[in-house]
From Swiss-Prot:
The active site is at C328. The lineage of its organism: Bacteria, Pseudomonadati, Campylobacterota, Epsilonproteobacteria, Campylobacterales. GO terms for biological process: [2Fe-2S] cluster assembly; cysteine metabolic process. Master enzyme that delivers sulfur to a number of partners involved in Fe-S cluster assembly, tRNA modification or cofactor biosynthesis. Catalyzes the removal of elemental sulfur atoms from cysteine to produce alanine. Functions as a sulfur delivery protein for Fe-S cluster synthesis onto IscU, an Fe-S scaffold assembly protein, as well as other S acceptor proteins. The keyword DNA repair does not apply. Pfam families: Aminotran_5. Transmembrane segments: none annotated. It is an enzyme of class 2 (transferase). One of its GO terms (cellular component) is cytoplasm. Pyridoxal 5'-phosphate binds at A73, T74, N155, Q183, S203, A204, H205, T241. This is Cysteine desulfurase IscS. It comes from the Bacteria.
Amino acid sequence: MLQRIYLDNNATTRIDPKVKEIMDPFLRDHYGNPSSLHQFGTETHPAIAEALDKLYKGINARDIDDVIITSCATESNNWVLKGVYFDECLKKGKNHIVTTVAEHPAVRSTCNFLESLGVEVTYLPINEHGSITAEQVKEAITEKTALVSVMWANNETGLIFPIEEIGAICKEKGVLFHTDAVQAIGKIPVDVLKANADFLSFSAHKFHGPKGIGGLYIRSGVGLTPLFHGGEHMNGRRSGTLNVPYIVGMGEAMKLAVEHLDYEKEVVGKLRDKLEEALLKIPDVMVVGDRIHRVPNTTLVSVRGIEGEAMLWDLNRSNIAASTGSACASEDLEANPVMVAIGASKELAHTAIRLSLSRFNTEAEIDKTIEVFSQAAIRLRNISSSY
């Protein structure tokens, strides 16, 4: 069987063997409903508490009760935006939300939905480097602003947004602040206190945990109308039977993610840089966005004259997995929205390829990717009508 190389880790990651190992007993033996009063239920409580302890410490929250279990970051993002709509827009008349054009569809689409209900949403444009400034946020805030929602790191470019500065402005202005940290956790340090975040979303499968489980940090003292009703789980904040094995797995994945932060920076970052430098030697290849203020695993490259989908399928034939952008939208085969937002033509935006590494990638895999990518660029340009 040919070697398979996975370079789509911003879409999802392989589960860490240590995570699977710690989950197994709760799939096989300790399968009781935690809400049950008998021993099958109560014996799961220590493991849940330990997992929550790992989660709140992993983001430097003040209290274990500040982290609420959800099914994924999409749910977390929806909960924040719709909860703020109920709590601030309807009840207090604060009918304005500030976000950016670079957000994940889970935020953008929810904001579009809220607009249909009469909420005013300001979508801050990104600059030629793919970022925004804290000053843009400050200028956009009005007395009617209920929430600012800005991602910590972009899923396509890996660019890190000025979260601490934005959080400080929101605190000063008395505006709630939410950050989608899905692409930051496990790659760079994430500290909700330094960020002055009121809400923070995360998803286990982006840091080598299981799919179908995520979390939402809600700062102590901040209220948020529940998205789901029908039970008193998570202190009455999120109804639904607790998914014990996945909670346990997510806790362990968070612990391992924090432990591997130096490895991400020193090893994964150097592999990404090696890949990037080699690809830049191919004529008319460019890296999209700021190359300095990024998470260490991500590069978004444009190969002029080659449709991103064509390159993607060529790599796939050689058992190399990459992406043209967000996995939640990639089946649509639309132009890369970040490239469009920074002012690239739609023709150029269609040439984007995202390569995202993990701690499980090897230098041999990167060398093979460089070889295959370079050969594919030559072959596809020879048959391209636009190069």
